[in-house]
């Protein structure tokens, strides 16, 4: 049987967990096997910037960072379950990637 590998990524942790919960509910309703969600390493993007606009004075820095959270879910590729997965309302800032594997 084929498996569907679902990869979720985004900057808002709560929204990713909300989408994972919806996928779990679909798997329970349709009776397919589910593995995950497996948390993948969080990527931290750090941008240091100078506080003073002209370069004069002491060198003080602001450190801005953005964290990208990722989750991985494996689910059996049942036609009914995949149809329901396609109908999930995913927030704009959450990336979802579905790959079918044999």
Curated annotation (Swiss-Prot):
PROSITE patterns: RIBOSOMAL_S10. GO terms for molecular function: structural constituent of ribosome; tRNA binding. InterPro entries: Ribosomal_uS10, Ribosomal_uS10_CS, Ribosomal_uS10_dom, Ribosomal_uS10_dom_sf, Ribosomal_uS10_euk/arc. The keyword Lyase does not apply. Keywords: Ribonucleoprotein, Ribosomal protein. Disulfide bonds: none annotated. Coiled coil: none annotated. It comes from the Archaea. One of its GO terms (biological process) is translation. GO terms for cellular component: small ribosomal subunit. Part of the 30S ribosomal subunit. Belongs to the universal ribosomal protein uS10 family. Involved in the binding of tRNA to the ribosomes. NCBIfam families: uS10_euk_arch. This is Small ribosomal subunit protein uS10. It comes from Methanoculleus marisnigri (strain ATCC 35101 / DSM 1498 / JR1). The gene is rps10.
